[in-house]
Every structure is written in structure tokens, then in C-alpha cells.
Amino acid sequence: GVTFGNNTFVGVGSSGNIVRSTDNGTSWDNATTDNSTANNLSGVTFGNNTFVGVGSSGNIVRSTDNGSSFSTVTSPTSNNLFKVAFGNNTFVAVGSSGNIVRSTDNGTSWENTTDSNSMLYVSWSEVSEVGSNSQIRVKSYDNSSWSTIDGDGNNGINLIGSRNATNPSMADNGTHLFAVWSEDDGAGNGLIRSAVYDNNSQAWDFLNSNYQALNNSTSNSANNPQLLYNNSSLYVIWSENNGTANQVRVRQFDNSSSWNLVDNIGANTTGINKDTSRNAINPKMMNFNSEIYAAWSESDGTASQIRVAKFDNSSSWTFVDGNSSTGINKATGKNATDPTMAVLSTKLYLSWSETNADNRTQIRVKSYDGSSWSFVDGDNATQGINKDYTQNASYPQLVTVTEGNIENSTDNGVSWNNATSYSSSSKLYAVWLEENGNSQVRVAEFDGTSTWSFKDGDSFDGLNINTAKITGKPSAVAYLNQLIVAWSEINSLGVPQIRVASSPF
């Protein structure tokens, strides 16, 4: 790397070599350095009359005499550092495994900063060792080891440990980890609970000071919540029975203690269903073109339809699925369930499970360019992207993995968020569960046009640890430029285990 400052060019390179020129690059001399380890240096910058270089094994050097001599400073990381920059009296360096370090004292001392993309979180529902109630458990992964962050006791993060809790969902805004789940009220109704993890106290705090559930009515049962962090706001979507039918409800967090309903469509104040007299289930949200899109499965009286609506970030939802009595199904007379969404380049992709004429469920995929929907699964009436279209496939997940993340900080480098980036190197993956005598976790990659290629070995079996054992529905996320897949799988003792795998598989 090379930089310029105070009429001086400074270049850094292999084996800790540092050179400088004070005559506009005509001649160069070696700078003196105490870099005894001779680590390679790859980045250098200038700010506030100081040159700072960074390199392998977390090596950091600085010069305050116009590049004549460099001294090694204590680094908070042993990960390789690639680049360094200066701004607002702060040096920031970035490196491998999502590592980001900063200095606010002219490069004298450095600290690790919070990078939301450097931690992986997994949550699930597990029966307690004491009693028979299911608890919400949470673990974090720092790219080397797993840590329990739910108290590690008999109870998880349930509000009431003696109540069953299921269907957790999490979201990270860069400074806090949020969780929602459905918890039994003791009478068989599901209550949507919400909590935030405090990194300092390492404890979970409930987002409502009076522990009020998020349900529109706590006398109604609600389930399948999902969180989405969008435009500095936190949203939650879920399905709630109003005594007549299941309604899709949405709330927005005010970043303090209140959740406000934002689920009106015109005169409809009971949710965002197309028909509020019909059941709507399994809702999901995704950010696309700076707006929130929601997709869910809703009955039309004959079959379940995939419905899609978008939110204007104010108060209004608009259907983008044709706004007719049917949705975007391949066959509107067949049941379609479990929608999932992701964004690749300039398009929104939506996948779901739909029954074909042979009563076999297929994984279907459509893309949306902001005005129209197109099938990208072969557009075949009989088969979707299943490994074997004669077998049932269900619970799809879509994930975009970008090779090279963009991080942004608005607090002088203290914390960092993963910015939305869909470069030409981004890849779209589909993950689902498919039968072959046993349930298998399957993974396929989209080529951006019309072809899906299997990335799970492309054989009879999928990712399962033991392909002869039953698995539960998978979950998938992007983490440090990799696809991470988690699922529940029965072990040899007949006990479900949470399994996690990373690409390449």
C-alpha cells in the first residue's frame, strides 16, 4: 500500500518493508522500524501528522516524524489487517474474519469495535432438563467457538419459564440483538414476546416495561413471529387468530418501549390479509427498494394463495401480487405455503412450497422487478427446483451471500452495521427440506438467469449428519461471506439436535 501526506509518499510491503519519498517520488529511502517480526504490511494512511501502517497478524506501526521511523504499537487483534483509513480524528483498520479496530489517540492505542456481521446467532426451542416445558435457547458464534447467551440455566429467555415457548426469530441492528417468540399464556393461547440482549450485563431485557405481549388482543392466540430491521426501525410480523380467522399483524418498535400497529390496508384495520374472513399464516418480511415487502399464505376458500404486499414506511400497505382473489401461485387451485424472500441485484425473489397435480409439493421460485413477477424455477407445471420432483419438498429458505461485505459506522467507528450490497459477486441460495425416504436438507445455487445447481453434494442425500435420520425445517443466513444452514436432526438416541453447517458443503 502507498499513501501521501505532508509532502511525503510512504509505501509499505512484504517483510515489514517501509519506504518513503520526499521529492515527489523521484528517489526513495528505507524508513527505520522496530517491526522485529517483519510481518507483511498491506495498508497505510496519513492523518493528523501521523502515518499508520497495518498488516498480517494484526501488526500496526506508526510514525510521527514524517515517515522517517516507525514504531510498533500494541494491537487488539491477531487477525490479518488489510486496510486503514483516517477521518474525524479516528484511525480505523479492517481485516479478516470481519475484524475492525480503531484508534482515537493518533494511533497510540487501539481497540476492537462492534461489528454486527462478525457474530452469528442461533435460537431454537428446547424442552427443559427440568420439567417438560420448551424454552427459547440462544447461542452466539464468533467464527471459532459457540457461547451460550441465554443464562445457561434450566430456563432460556422465556418470560415465564414454566410456559412453552416456540418459533423464535432474531434481528441484529449492529448494537443490540433482538428476539421475538410465541409463548403460551397458560390457557393454550400464544403470546408474542419480545426481548433485547444487553452486551454489558449479558442479560435479556423485555422490550415492554409491563411485559405486555405484542398481540393485537392478548385473548387471541398468535404465532410464527418474524423480526426485520429496516431503515433504523425494528418491525415484527405474525399471524393472530381474531376468533374468526388468522390475521397477519405488523408492529413497529419506537426504539424506546412501545410497539405500534402499522398493519392497516385502506379501511381494513384487522390486519393486512387480502380477505380478513380467511386464514392467513406463515408471514415473512424483506426490505426491497427501501420498502418493506410482506408475503404470507392465505386461503381463498379453495386453496391457499401466496399473497404479497408492500409498506410505504408510513401507514399504508399495497398489494403487489395482482390484487385479485388469487395470489402468485403457479396453480391457483393448489395449496401454497411457507413463503420466503431474498434480494439479488435489482430483483426481489420469493420462494414457497406448492402442491402439483400429482399432490407432490414443489419448491417454486419467482422474481419481482418492481412491476411484474416471473418464474425462475423452470416454469414447469409439474416440477419446481426439487432434487426429485416425485418427492415432497417443504420449508424453503432464500439467502443472498455477498463476497465482500460493506460495513458502515455512524458513531465514529464504535459500532458497525452490514450495509446492503448486491454486487456482481453476490449469490442466491435456496435451502429446503425434501423427502427421499427420510427428510434431507437440500441446497441449490441460482445462476442469476434460470438455472439452479445443487451445492449439497448433488446426490441422493442432502446435508444431514446422518442421512438416515429425520430432520426438522432448516434455517439459513449469510455470515462472513458464507452460507450458514442450521436444522434439527434426530441423533442415535432419538433426541433432536441442532446442527449447523457452513459453505462450501
Write out the residue ranges for each language-model feature.
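Short coil-to-beta transitions that initiate beta-strands within beta-rich domains
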Residues: D34-T45, P76-A85
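Acidic carboxylate motifs that coordinate Ca2+ or other divalent cations, activating on Asp/Glu
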Residues: D23, D65, D105, D411
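Loop/turn residues immediately N-terminal
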Residues: G16-I18, G58-I60, G98-I100
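Extracellular, repeat-based ectodomains that mediate carbohydrate processing or recognition
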Residues: G1-G5, F9, G13, T33, ...
